[in-house]
């Protein structure tokens, strides 16, 4: 029997962009879900920004954690407008208060932030978000997850369900936002090209444990072929990125 994450110790320094790869069932999603609060570990502790969140439910951890799922239709309210979704994101982690209308100044701020995505969505603030494409929704979900900079940003294969053009755009936005806001980030991916070209640390998981941990300089010297060779023996599918 394999006990997921048994004995695993992982520290992510402030501002580090950690990329995690591994075969299906290797423990990648379990690691991410454990941090997010999807389940409570049997032993051990989870510390986020100096706070022990081990026994906190997911909704309590929302003040510390931003998350973007693989499914572009998760993380947003499809019947609400772009502006309304962003307003909810702006209130994350703040004391509960009645929702009020959008002031002109706040609406202008939202439009400015949306314009930064480079998708022309600043002119569609009153459009229900469910009418947008998957790439547009995922870009907005990324913006919402980082509207108030989280202590850690969790990216769960967040470009895997997008067409190649949208995936490239969302990944470029990801790097831009993470770099500008100096966000501590954990990204799970099956794309070996992303694994080598994104982030400044690379982790490979196998059977619930860390099988490889490379710093930025080490991973920058690897080729996709060399990384695939290290990946050999994994049970899941791999996308080479070529």
Cite the ranges covered by each PLM segment.
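The feature captures the beta-strand-to-loop junction immediately N-terminal to the Walker
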Residues: 21-23
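Helix-to-loop junction immediately C-terminal to a conserved catalytic motif
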Residues: 36
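Conserved ABC transporter NBD signature motif
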Residues: 44-51, 212-214
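ABC ATPase NBD coupling module
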Residues: 52-66, 74, 96-103, 220-225
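A short, proline-enriched helix->beta-strand linker immediately N-terminal to the Walker B motif
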Residues: 147-151
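Catalytic Walker B motif of ABC-type/P-loop ATPase nucleotide-binding domains
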Residues: 153-156
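H-loop/switch region of ABC-family ATPase nucleotide-binding domains
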Residues: 189-190
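Conserved beta-strand-loop-alpha-helix hinge in the C-terminal portion
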Residues: 209-233
């Amino acid at each position: 029997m394999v006990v997921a994450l048994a004995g695993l110790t992982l520290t992510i320094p402030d501002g580090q962009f950690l990329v995690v790869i591994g075969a299906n069932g290797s423990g990648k999603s379990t690691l991410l879900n454990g941090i997010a609060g999807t389940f409570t570990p049997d032993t051990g502790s989870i510390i986020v920004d100096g706070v022990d969140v081990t026994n906190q439910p997911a909704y309590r951890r929302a003040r510390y954690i931003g998350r973007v799922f693989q499914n572009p239709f998760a993380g947003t309210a499809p019947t609400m407008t772009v502006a309304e979704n962003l307003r909810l994101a702006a209130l994350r982690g703040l004391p509960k208060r009645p929702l009020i209308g959008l002031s002109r100044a706040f609406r202008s701020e939202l439009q400015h932030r949306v314009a930064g995505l480079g998708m022309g969505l600043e002119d569609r603030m009153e459009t229900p978000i469910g009418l947008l494409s998957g790439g547009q929704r995922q870009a907005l979900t990324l913006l919402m997850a980082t509207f108030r900079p989280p202590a850690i940003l969790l990216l769960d294969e967040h470009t895997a369900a997008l067409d190649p053009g949208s995936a490239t755009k969302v990944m470029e936005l990801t790097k831009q936002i993470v770099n500008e806001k100096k966000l501590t980030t954990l990204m799970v991916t099956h794309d070996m090209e992303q694994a080598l070209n994104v982030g400044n640390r690379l982790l490979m998981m196998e059977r619930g444990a860390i099988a490889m941990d490379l710093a930025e300089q080490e991973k920058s010297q690897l080729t996709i072929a060399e990384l695939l060779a290290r990946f050999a023996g994994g049970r899941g599918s791999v996308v080479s990125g070529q």
